Swiss-Prot record:
Domain of life per record: Eukaryota
GO biological process annotation, one example: protein glycosylation
UniProt-recorded name of the protein: UDP-GalNAc:beta-1,3-N-acetylgalactosaminyltransferase 2
Keyword Transport: no
Family indicated by similarity: Belongs to the glycosyltransferase 31 family.
Keywords on record: Endoplasmic reticulum, Glycoprotein, Glycosyltransferase, Golgi apparatus, Membrane, Signal-anchor, Transferase, Transmembrane, Transmembrane helix
Reactions this protein catalyses: 3-O-(N-acetyl-beta-D-glucosaminyl-(1->4)-alpha-D-mannosyl)-L-threonyl-[protein] + UDP-N-acetyl-alpha-D-galactosamine = 3-O-[beta-D-GalNAc-(1->3)-beta-D-GlcNAc-(1->4)-alpha-D-Man]-L-Thr-[protein] + UDP + H(+)
Species the sequence originates in: Danio rerio
Segments traversing the membrane: 3-23
Keyword Phosphoprotein part of the UniProt annotation: no
UniProt-annotated location(s): Golgi apparatus membrane; Endoplasmic reticulum
Pfam families in UniProt: Galactosyl_T
Amino acid sequence: MRSAAAALSVCVLAVLLHWICWTDRSAELLGFRAADRPKADVREVLVGVLSARHNHELRQAIRDTWLGYLKQHPHFQNRVLVKFIIGAQGCSVPLEDLEDQYSCSQLELSEAAVSGQEMAILSVPDSSALLQSDVPVLSLDFKVLHSVVITQLGVFPNKPPHYLKGNITVRLLQVDQEEAVISARFSSVSPGTAADGMFYKPVEQFILPKGFEGTLLWEAEDSTALMSVNTSALRLNNGGGVLHFRSIEEGTLPHRNALGFPGLAGGFTFTVYDVEVLSEMLRGRSGRQKIREAQLKGEDEALQEESLRHGDMVFVDVVGTYRNVPSKLLQFYKWSVENADFSLLLKTDDDCFIDVDAVLMKMQRRRLTHTSLWWGNFRQNWAVDRVGKWQELEYASPAYPAFACGSGYVVSRDLVQWLASNAQHLKAYQGEDVSMGIWMAAVGPRKYQDSGWLCEKECYVDMLSSPQHSAEELRLLWSRKNKCGDPCGCS
């Protein structure tokens, strides 16, 4: 009996030793040996997950998949810290009253917009306000915030009043389009009709819908034919808030694709389209505001409850909109250097699948632990958009500096420290990924290119990240990985 018990003890001891060796070997492959395990408050990797306030289902899917795996893993739970990055404030403007869906700018509409009358963007009662242009082409950029119809195009007269010198063409173009939507030609023999200190000609009437972005061009054969106006004391009529004009102040830098210099050589008249719909919208504004306030209160309460329950959320002092994501990221960088001890920071989004085993293993195998490191999948010579979700009007170059796709990238602590220290001086551009590229261009980090950080919604067995997934898709990818090691499918 004793010999049997002794034999059994030897077997149990052998199995135990084998298990210990296997787990240590697994951890060693990933660079987490027990011998060099740091203190519990020191983390090898800090993961920041950009998350919209309302994306609680995506956050829960991450907690149920790769985040839950990290928390339960004996070698990873004290080496990797994951935090969701949340805007502390929600946008208080109802969706129907926003200028666009990407910001929190409210439509400043007034009763003047529903007058039903034809309006001019300006009048020149005194011809002494006019001055000769020193360039042959002037341009005015504007955006339509509620549908309008342009009825006439106009030019300023030369001195003396009611005289036009040379030939002038006025064209309205949609941004990034070459063909004119409407146009009119003015000359000394065909100057048009004089009204309010300007010559006007009627044009074919098109409905310019909400969101239309256009450029009005005044073109002359030589600059002496164009008259301009001192814009410093000028206020354009936006029709009660239905139009938004870009800056034409003296000294304004022309946009990189501008066809003319910012300025005015005339104007146009317009009417507001569908006044009845606009009137109804104005009447319902106060009711929508009350509903939105109640929604925000419920959203705040739900977020606080979620934060208390999970303890994995960082609220940064930013209004949670798409346009504010770069500022949101900078605020998280400030939080991270003040509140966490880490060597590397992995940034990702709440709709991204992350193969944490592959990331940590490659991190160790490639020894990606040095300073001035930026590890990601880099886009190069990426064109700057003038319209749409990725519209960028502030960055002057036609292409961005190299930037890593936002689905996942890793930066070393020293770079995070630099970003945090300079956050108040860094300009936020339209997206956090391109903003990061512009900011890092000043530092010149070592870029480690890795196509495993996917830029589009794709799936490969050796991928590190994949973006744009639903909560259900995140769970499916993770379950496949656990079942057969391939998130893309098990045969």
